[in-house]
């Protein structure tokens, strides 16, 4: 074996072997237990970042470990390759999105191979290819036929100057990113999939996901937002019109003092006809940012409509206001306002001098609403026949009254809205719907699929090429002239079923059910927690759609989910002459002074600018603190980068990038290499004879097999890869100090190194691949099994016993593992320190904790 550890040479050689032998290509095998490990596939942005490397290293470690368990392991990879960044890059670089995307895929594919990830490249998919999205289009038409797809108007960001729709990220401070025109909200027709029909199942089936993080399940429960309440009807005074309101707090209904409706509510638009102030306010509301964050932060404002509503129980009239905090696309677009028992309503009522009437108080006291609303549940008062009732009794009584009078009904509602899948972008899968000359909208016939997105286009930065290309939109269906839909799918569509396509990526159908049902569900899914409420919900929803279409036979797409933490790095900046922050790459920073905890106090860049250190933050382009994986691999090798990624922190926590720790990982691999080299240099080894081992050898072998057991448990059950590595490092320290004088010393070292190489193989596979053969083993390490724990090695011949007198340590003794209490007591009492502290005293009691402690009570 070569003496020096040369990662670039070793890794190139091993990767070539994997490629030549197609090591990681797999097929279905009914005789082997399958294991499907999947990391969320990347967007081909151009270069891998350290977040990618962490995600994919975790997945590769799990996959390689499971392979050594003898399982048939599938680990595929592909590209989530549609999306807005490609359009922006195409505009910037005067090219089309397609070539930019395919070039990035080629580059990033080489980076993934360079890191040694064991993917089945024969299953590679790119979502921007017709071979992939044709089946998405086909499935959409089937959902339409089942009544799960519909079209309705929905609000979008609209630039009136360019006459184009903007994505949320293209709206900067309320203006168009391109021309700085104030952005408006515009209602346009869009396609929706009825995810709400699956809301109850999506909620209930979270209970099946025992191996998903509780945080993700809680976020999904809140996003789905199931609530039980009453939908009640309010009549408009002096009119035959009425409107519905849903509330989860019917116990407060007797305290309604006004009603708030959305700017888009029919009553608001009707009232605005002769009310210029209201009309102006409605326009202002229509152009407001309606994201949750913006709604929470904005000032709550309103304008009275001049209309009154009739309370469904008291018959009293209450004013109807238009409020900017009520959304037409949420609930019924109207809310009952009880300022005494809702803080938002309270502040609004105070602002506009509206009545505040308390109707709920604590069960054991009075209610004080002089400073704020009382929002807890309690006992009703000032509520006529409902006085004295608690929340549930009031809920039931008010429900019964409203139901009997035909003014309301108990109802389950969900916060979840139907999934709007239309995007007014170019670089996405065309939605397979056509409009006939008579205005009828139908799905594109199956024999005309896929509807291919033209790739040879020019991006003008204003309008989608397929919207401006009138010829592309023209088609013929059943001999009739028709026009294609020019919207494209939300890219969450592609990422909602890719995991299933991997099972049969070349099938001339959406899925081959036999193959899909062999591999699915995914056994281990890995990705960031930021995907909890969007991708991971659509992912689950799509699986149920596939199930109900007879394509899969399981309820959920993934058994186990690991959400890895972010990768952080130091961030530095200086203010330029205009006062703007200029972020400086860590590689361009010289630290001049640190505090006693090693934190930067003073630093400069290569041009001498004094820098402000902002601490560790997520690696990002905006803070220029990303570390290029390519540079690290070139400098230290892929195995070092992988080892650092798995050792620096538990997988679900943030990882702080420290190059000194990367150097430490590199030193450890070199130490492993040297230990193996030195052992091999001593020549052939004899067979290990466990019965002839001396006490020191037995102890070393015990540590070896304890480590094998712990590492397996840490990787498989606990997923604490960092502690698994730490255990192997501790064992290596013991091995380096172990004697190599006798044949059994060498035989024991051979057993230990054979085990260590397999324990570390999932993490540093290139190094371990070579060492496995250098140690004299036949065949590739991928084809061997994880080391077995020899239970007999764990049995201890002796035990260390702590001896105390009156609770204080006085001696430590070593006794036979099977020594009786009497034997331990005799040995303990004979110890010099015990004799000294019991002399002249009476032993009152002897307490023995078997195998651990002897406590002598004497006075």
From Swiss-Prot:
Subcellular location: Cytoplasm
Pfam name, any one: tRNA-synt_1_2
GO CC entries: cytosol
Biological processes per GO annotation: leucyl-tRNA aminoacylation
Reaction(s) this enzyme catalyzes, per UniProt: tRNA(Leu) + L-leucine + ATP = L-leucyl-tRNA(Leu) + AMP + diphosphate
Primary subcellular site in the record, as a coarse category: cytoplasm
Keyword Transit peptide annotated: no
Keywords associated with the record: Aminoacyl-tRNA synthetase, ATP-binding, Cytoplasm, Ligase, Nucleotide-binding, Protein biosynthesis
Residue span of motif 'HIGH' region: 42-52
InterPro entries xref list: aa-tRNA-synth_I_CS, aa-tRNA-synth_Ia, Leu-tRNA-ligase, Leu_tRNA-synth_edit, M/V/L/I-tRNA-synth_anticd-bd, Methionyl/Leucyl_tRNA_Synth, Rossmann-like_a/b/a_fold, tRNAsynth_Ia_anticodon-bd
CDD domains xrefs: Anticodon_Ia_Leu_BEm, LeuRS_core
Broad EC category: ligase
Extent of motif 'KMSKS' region: 618-622
One annotated GO molecular function: leucine-tRNA ligase activity
Enzyme nomenclature, EC number: 6.1.1.4
Residues engaged in binding ATP: 621
PROSITE patterns assigned: AA_TRNA_LIGASE_I (PS00178)
Similarity comment: family membership: Belongs to the class-I aminoacyl-tRNA synthetase family.
Protein name, as recorded: Leucine--tRNA ligase
Gene: leuS
